[in-house]
Amino acid sequence: MLEAYRQHVAERAALGVPPKPLDDKQTAELVTLLKNPPAGEEAFLVDLLENRVPAGVDQAAYVKAAFLAAVAKGEATSPLVTKARAVYLLGTMLGGYNVAPLVDLLDDAELAPIAAEALKKTLLVFESFHDVAEKAQSGNGAAKEVMQSWADAEWFTSRPEVPAEITVTVFKVTGETNTDDLSPAQDAWSRPDIPLHANAMLKNVRDGNNPDKPTEIRQIKQIEALTDKVHTDSN
């Protein structure tokens, strides 16, 4: 799996795009390797776990959350992931499959503080909100902290302030902007692959869509596009 993924990374780099995240099969193989890591691959395996598995309710996220929950509860072990680290990483998964294990861990005397900090910054908890509220009403101190943090919107107030000024490069597009500009039909096959599909944006030169510096426009990291009208379709 590691050799194949490294080859994939190289192929994507040649296209100027980041590698795809791991799918559920690759993540399952990663979990197996994390439990018994090959010598010299430890840092790479940890990086894949932390940064290359999608968050939320993707099936790969399910595999990751299940593994981390098992480590946190002592049901699985890895020399590369401690119980505390497993709980912390659950807290980076935004919402979805990570929420139930974090709520359960509010009852763990050792790990409850870490689980609470994770939940304070997690908004997509859905029905699990009531589980946290019930624990708080039953006297669970960690759950009380989470409820108070949500009430105080610390998930928002703890974030960096919006910069007073933002410098951008303006690319003015005259006329109506539509799918042919932002998501050309001939590139529809790549739409699920957002970084790759982004290379097709504004590729079709037309009157009003002709960059002054076409070879440089893709190098700009932050651009403000001004247009007369954006057509209300698949864009």
Labelled PLM ranges:
Residues 2-31, 36:
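Amphipathic alpha-helical packing elements
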Residues 6, 27, 83-84, 99:
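Residue-level signal for cytosolic alpha-helical hairpin/rod architecture
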Residues 8, 29-32, 44, 181, ...:
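Residue-level detector of alpha-helical secondary structure
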Residues 15-20, 42-59, 73, 80-95, ...:
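Structural detector for internal amphipathic alpha-helices that build alpha-solenoid repeat scaffolds
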Residues 24-32, 55-74, 93-107, 124-136:
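Amphipathic alpha-helical scaffolding segments comprising HEAT/armadillo-like alpha-solenoid repeats
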Residues 36-39, 51-58, 188, 207:
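Short helix-loop boundary/capping segments at the starts of domains
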Residues 115-235:
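Fe-S-dependent hydro-lyases/dehydratases of central metabolism
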